[in-house]
Structures are given as C-alpha cells and as structure tokens.
C-alpha cells in the first residue's frame, strides 16, 4: 500500500477519558512529526519502535491538545506498516480536530475496516482471523468472546490448512502419476486416497456439527414471547430484563408492536421479543402486530407461550397452540398468585412441551424458568468444549461445498472414475476451503467483508 491512512479508533458519538487517532502507512511517522511537538523537542523519526512520547498536537502551528504519541515501526505492528497512535483527550470535538490535523498533514481518511484489511493483505493474519476481529468487538457473551479469540489465534485456520494440505498432497500424487505412470502406481494408492478423503470429510463434518451451537453462541437464542392479551407477556419481559422495558397496564392490546431485549442467561444470550397479544381484533394497528407476532414465532428458536393460569383456555389459546405445535415451546403458566384454573396437566393434554408456573407480578418461579431454558438447549449445563466453532454463515456454506466435493471424490473412487476427474473435485474442495482463510479470495468479496467493520479498525 503506497498511501497512508488515518481514522479515529475510539467512539465518535460520545466523549470518554481518551480518544485514539490511528495512522498507518509508509508516511505515518513523517505525518506524525508534522503534527506532533514533543515536550523534549525530539523527532518521531529518530525514536525507537514501540515507544511513547508526550507533547502537543498542532495544526499549521496552532496547538489543539496535549497527547501521548505511540510510535510502532514496521513490520512488528497490527498492519505490518509503520503506525503512529495519538492518545488525546476524549472529547468529540478535540478528537475530530486531531484527525483533521493528521489529514491536513497528508494522510487519507481510512475506509471502514481498512487497518484490518491491510493486516490481511500484508500477511499478518488470514481472512478468518480478520473476521474474528469484528466478532470480538460484537461478542455478546463470554462464550462468543472466547470462540472469537480462538479464531483470531488461528485455531480455525489451522484446522482448515490441515485439511487443505492433505487434499493437495493427493492431487500432487495423482498428477505425478498421470505424468509418470511407471514410477507412481495410482491403483496401489487408491486405498490411501480413499482413507485421506474420508478423514478430510470427517474433519469438515466435525466443524459443521458446531454450527448450531456456534450460531447460538454468536447470535443468541431467538426467543419469541407469545400469548393472548393481558396474559403477562410484557411483565415477564420486564422481570427477565430486570428493568421496566415494556409498558404494563390492565388494558387489553397495550402491546401493539414488538419489543426486543437481550439478556444473558448463564453466559448465553437470549434475544427476547415481546409481541402483541394474539386475539381477533378490528383494530388495524393491533392486527398488524398480531400478524407480525405469528410470523416471528415461525422463525424462533424458542417460543415462550405465556398463559393466564387464572382463566380457562379459549379459542385464542387453541389457535396459538396450533401455530406453535411444531416449535420448541416453553409454556409459562403465569399469575400463580391468583387461583389457578388452567394447570400444567391441562396444557400437556394438548401439547408435548415443558411448563413452568410463575408469578411475574411477585417474581416467583423465575429461577425455575431459567433452569428449564438451559435444560431445553444445553442439557442443564451451558458448556462449550470445542476450541473452534463455526459462527459465520460464509464459513458454513463453504464447508458444505467442500464436503459435497469430497463426497463426489469418494463416489468417483467407488465407481472407478478416471483419476484426472477426481482431481477436479479435490481442487474444488481445496479452493472452497481456501476461501475461508482468504487463500483464494477475490477483491470484491474482501471489500464486502471489511466494509462491515467499524471505522478505525
């Protein structure tokens, strides 16, 4: 990269103790010297790498702020380029002024994710490691963070590279045998080839088996709270969120649109969606909310169906139970503080599902509710033992393509297909796996991936 880029690496929408303006590229230190006036009257070009210096940031001779400046010289930096980081006071205005000074001194404003993109293009990290950076930033729970850190450390890359190496070794042998059949006996090596492909297929399949837990770890459990009007759905949301997120009244139809809240349950994220109470209504707005609730239930990982246990089941209840009969459902018998009319036995006569009795008003039964959710998803213990989880849809699809190609190779071996045709499917698997770590990537795909990053990263 010939140009030098700069951006604010901390928040641009709120003030803080400090802000960081990052500069990376061949002229980073030169630009740093243009804007930095050291208290010791030293030049950044003359200092050792990975050192910190105190002084003022200036723009055309006008002092903007006191700052600490960190100098990091290539190649031992995040981007493998010269980097200068300016730690200034964390006000929004002063930080923008410092960035303006750097841009006026010759830097170009970085695109979103461009620092990490340069780390990838300069070979410090591969593409899956680069994607792990944004996953670390967006991690919602401890498990997602740990998985992302493992990916950044290269544990996924190592598994992918091991599979690719086995594939490539077999392609090389087949091609050598085709060129020199007198010295390389393909027929004698068929069993070894089949064994290698089966091992590769097994390794790819083991990665794919982590996808479901990986998605839950990364995105959380899509949880829709469903029920009739005034069953206590919004009260339950407030109790689980431990704050007054939803308006609660005795008036039916108070909740007309969805309300979302994220909670952490023993290290796993539940994405709770409170929905409009399901009933027949002539109100246009409420009707839209009811239809939206039904559609959300169709795509939910978990439906929490809240029943007013102080009332008998009616047609609206039966409609809801028909809607969710094929889903993973937890029925909450709410209003245990009142005389119970509908019981767990009544529900289980109609649906095969878990039930918990609570009082959202008195906040009783909530611990049992949380334990039941854990049992439904994690057999009572939230525990992830693998060091690598597939959390990216992109990785999942590429692994599936590679797996399909490897299956075609096995079919070809069993049907005694010509070896040169086997190499076509082997190379297809090799290339799709390479796309995961960026070995075979095209510029437009790389640009799409890095455009999802925040500015300054």
Regions found by a protein language model. Name each.
Residues 53-65, 69-73, 253-281, 299-302:
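Switch I (G2) and immediately adjacent beta-strands of P-loop GTPase domains
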Residues 14, 25-27, 73-77, 91-93, ...:
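Conserved nucleotide-binding/hydrolysis micro-motifs of P-loop NTPases
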Residues 272, 306, 332:
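Generic enzyme active-site microenvironment
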Residues 3-9, 142-264, 281-283, 313-457:
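C-terminal-of-GTPase-core extension/linker across diverse P-loop GTPases
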Residues 16-17, 50-52, 299-303, 326-329, ...:
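Short glycine-/polar-rich loops that comprise or flank the Walker A/P-loop
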Residues 13, 62, 76, 217, ...:
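Conserved catalytic network of the ASCE P-loop NTPase/AAA+ motor domain
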Residues 1-146, 150, 154, 330:
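A glycine-rich (often HGG/GG-containing) alpha/beta subdomain
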Residues 286-310:
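Inter-motif core of Ras-like GTPase G domains
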